[in-house]
Amino acid sequence: MRKKVDERIRTLIENGVKLRHRSMFVIIGDKSRDQIVNLHHMLSKAVIKCNPSVLWCYKDKLDISSHKQKRSKQLKRLRERGQLDPEKLDAFSRLLDVGRVTHCLYKDSERILGNTFGMCILQDFEALTPNLLARTIETVEGGGLVVLILRSLTSLTSLCTMVMDVHDRFRTESHSEAAGRFNERFLLSLASCKACVVMDDELNILPLSSHIRSITQVPTEKDSEGLSEAERDLKSLKEDLSDDFPVGPLIKKCCTLDQGKAVVTFFDAILDKALRSIVALIASRGRGKSAALGLAVAGAVAAGYSNIYITAPSPDNLKTFFEFVCKGFDALEYKEHLDYDVVKSANPDFKKAVVRINIFKQHRQTIQYIQPHEHEKLSQVELLVIDEAAAIPLPVVKSLLGPYLVFLSSTVSGYEGTGRSLSLKLLQQLDEQSRAPATGLEGSGCLFKKIELTESIRYGSGDPIESWLNGLLCLDVATCLPNPACHPSPSQCDLYYVNRDTLFSYHKDSELFLQRMMALCVSSHYKNSPNDLQLLADAPAHHLFVLLGPVDESQNKIPDILCVIQVCLEGKISENSALQSLRDGHSPYGDQIPWKFCEQFRDTEFPGFSGARIVRIAVHPNAMKMGYGSAAVELLTRYFEGQIAPISEAEDKVDVEHAPIKVTEAAEKVSMLEEQVKPRTNLPPLLVPLHDRRPEKLHYIGVSFGLTLDLFRFWRKHNFAPFYVSQIPSAVTGEHTCMLLKPLKNDELEVNESDELGFFTPFYKDFKIRFSKLLSDKFKKMDYKLAMSVLNPKINFAEVDSSGSSSGGFLKTLNGILSPYDMERLRAYTENLTDFNLVYDICKTLAHQYFEEKLPVSLSYVQASILLCLGLQETDFSSIERQMQLERGQIHSLLLKVARELYKYLNGVAGKEIKSALPRLKERELTAHNVSVDDDIREGAKQVEEQMKKEKIEGLMDSELQQYVIGDKEAEALQHSKISSSGIISVKSTKSENENGFDKSTKKRSSDKRSSSSSKSKSSKKRKSLKE
């Protein structure tokens, strides 16, 4: 049966087409898909052109296949079963066949960026996230429709209790009940959107959309040519510049007056060719920033610029930029392949994105993409374009600036807007520098211009869907943050707990407080996304605290927010879960610090501790460096230690937010056409003083952030100690992720009261040793100041410490560390007998021992830093000169002082040990005589004489006395004879004549022989006696 469509629906669509405003329809019911054909038909008649294109987004499955052949078979089966009305079936299939429908999975929604559709259909509401909602709605052109299909809902309030797919990521082992605050706020916000209609599957408008009850046709202010005022101004600008080359042809490619003026401003800077000139272009999403930059770069090529570089977080962000560079070339009558070539990347990570354009019409010119951290390639640059600068870390953006022309663009709101406070910090600094006189310093005296685009390309200004989406997702909150009325002393400020039920209730005052709080987070140095809002609203473990000054209750106004802290409760993980995670090598969502601690130290007890992780801490941009952040951290620490309110003994009865309350209690008792949805009235207070709420029982507070020197020093100042630094830096920010802990005073843990780190001390020492060993490889490029802050070495030792008696950790021996030869080389270096190359290996050894606090030698900060750079990071002297701004001679002088101090201590500890270990020659012991020299000579002479006598007697030979031998007969005769008076006897010889009278010559030779031997014997005896 045919039914007349409510005229207000048709009027809303036609008004949107006339004003180039988008309209939104929320259809509730199982047959909501059938009404899409009717809405598409009404839109086609209103736009008076070809059928509007359709984007159909879904989770994982379509009711009717997007494949033509499969769809025909599927529709045939449904027709045979009688499950579809043939008339409706034919209309729907006709829409799919000729309606230019693009189907897209939610997980693949990034590929639709930059495309424009006339109608967007969103089904499977449970899979939607704030990011997906913003990303898909932004693709709809002015006059188009956004259709949200909600099936299987018995009432509108059942949307508040719907379980979303993203809730699985919010649940942890100790916090398993996710809330539906975001959906409740989403539902209530639909009533405030003037271009949104909520209806059932029969196109009956529900009471929630009572605001369109009196909708009427709107007149359009157009001239005889059918142009609006903005369109007339743009036409006039194009006509005025039509004769100017090359800006005239480029202006014809602009779609809005703002975009045209931006191109003219860019081209003025190009022709000026002033050094250190910066033009900044800021706008919300969809204003044509990248297109304006592309046209301006095409004009720079025509003006003769040769080296043009473009940088962005990823080449994917430059698709529109390079597209409009080529369109600019077409307008200037450049021909591809004849005048220029487009080069695509071969890197698979860049997905064949355009990275270079080579131009060779006039002379060789290049438009080249570089990554943000490659600033060293800018030596020959003439024009640098920085697109999406807000997504690049602020220090990196500053390093890219130099003595050349810079075009800078950034999204300051919308779902791509980031919270790097680019417009509040960098642009403010550039503006101040441009006003200051040139002093010769870097960055001074630069020319700075700022352009802001307000008119959207896709839809007309004042689009109600854009306003609704910005308010729902807190996207355009830059104007919602007023300056504090005063800056009270941090000691006078108090920390308050924020009740999230009241915060997301869509009450007027609560909504204003939420917008200001999110504006404060966006203006801080954190990168934000719309998904963070849903996490903040629905995650059961997350809590909010705000620091406020003294509140005057007599004034009925919202107090100024000085600081916001977002806290996530973690821990209470069973030991079985921890063991399972170690075995599988996979950590579940949430509980970042417990899982990372368990992974790093293989400790299964720590995940059972309960703790709180500070997700973010954001201070008002006009109250920075005033102590409010430190005051908030101190108050939060005291609160969780039970110093402000007593800690609850029964943890299950902690007064957290109340359980989610239904928007209307009688919703299930009335029909959908009679259901009234309004904000709750019986809400608890938004702000709760800490002394009125019992804190959870915790063992520690932790924090995780991108490692920078200022942030690390802030947390170390509050006694947080690191236990993890990621070895691989972030591809987006270039920062290493760092996690720190601060143990809280707890009666359940037995620790040494004098140790401020408590149970965490041994883990912290182990981390420092591991970090020092990684400095030569993974953290070699880390700034020495940051490395010194992470290690936090003790460099000032008292005299009692230097003696080694106050600590058992000091070196007592050099066994296994330095050999005696090493000590000799070190001594030679300290005495200037050799150069540093001879002791470079010793420097690395001593550096590790010193930073492990085993050498109690007091050094200055600069001396310790040089030891760290050379010994731990193993950098060269040129790098140290560049980082520390010191001359090489100064570095060598300081290094020599370090070596002398270390050698002095080592020599005192193990000096005797070193001497005993060195090899040496054997020494002889000489003793004095007990007698005088004269007595010694006389005694020696006496000995010689006695020896000579003895040798003389023994020297007589038998052969020499043979001639005097008496034979036997002669002896017998002598016995019988008498001796004469003369004493001579005569004996008869028995030998022959020759025998008795041997040869005279023989006698003579024997005589000479005896005489010579006798003389030799005497002379040898004399020499022997002299020696003795």
Curated annotation (Swiss-Prot):
Q: Which InterPro entries match?
A: GNAT_dom, NAT10, NAT10/TcmA_helicase, P-loop_NTPase, TmcA/NAT10/Kre33, TmcA_N, tRNA_bind_dom
Q: Where is the composition biased (Basic residues)?
A: 1018-1028
| Positions of ATP binding | G286, R287, G288, K289, S290, A291, A292, L293, G294, L295, R458
Question: Pfam families, per this entry?
Answer: GNAT_acetyltr_2, NAT10_TcmA_helicase, TmcA_N, tRNA_bind_2
Region of interest: Disordered: 982-1028
Alphabetical UniProt keywords: Acyltransferase, ATP-binding, Nucleotide-binding, Nucleus, rRNA processing, Transferase, tRNA processing
What's a single GO BP term from this record? tRNA acetylation
EC number(s): the record gives 2.3.1.-
**Reaction it catalyzes:** a cytidine in 18S rRNA + acetyl-CoA + ATP + H2O = an N(4)-acetylcytidine in 18S rRNA + ADP + phosphate + CoA + H(+); a cytidine in tRNA + acetyl-CoA + ATP + H2O = an N(4)-acetylcytidine in tRNA + ADP + phosphate + CoA + H(+)
Q: Where is the composition biased (Basic and acidic residues)?
A: 990-1001
Binding, acetyl-CoA: I617, A618, V619, M624, K625, M626, G627, Y628, G629, S630, K717
The Gene Ontology terms for molecular function here are: 18S rRNA cytidine N-acetyltransferase activity; ATP binding; tRNA N4-acetyltransferase activity
GO cellular component annotations of the record: nucleolus
In this protein, which residues make up the domain named N-acetyltransferase? Answer: 546-729
The family note in this entry says: Belongs to the RNA cytidine acetyltransferase family. NAT10 subfamily.
Instruction: Extract the PANTHER family matched here.
Output: N-ACETYLTRANSFERASE 10 (PTHR10925), RNA CYTIDINE ACETYLTRANSFERASE 2 (PTHR10925:SF7)
Q: What is this protein's function per UniProt?
A: RNA cytidine acetyltransferase with specificity toward both 18S rRNA and tRNAs. Catalyzes the formation of N(4)-acetylcytidine (ac4C) in 18S rRNA. Required for early nucleolar cleavages of precursor rRNA at sites A0, A1 and A2 during 18S rRNA synthesis. Catalyzes the formation of ac4C in serine and leucine tRNAs. Requires a tRNA-binding adapter protein for full tRNA acetyltransferase activity but not for 18S rRNA acetylation.
Question: Entry's HAMAP family?
Answer: RNA_acetyltr_Nat10
Protein name stated in the entry: RNA cytidine acetyltransferase 2
Q: Which organism is it from?
A: Arabidopsis thaliana (Mouse-ear cress)
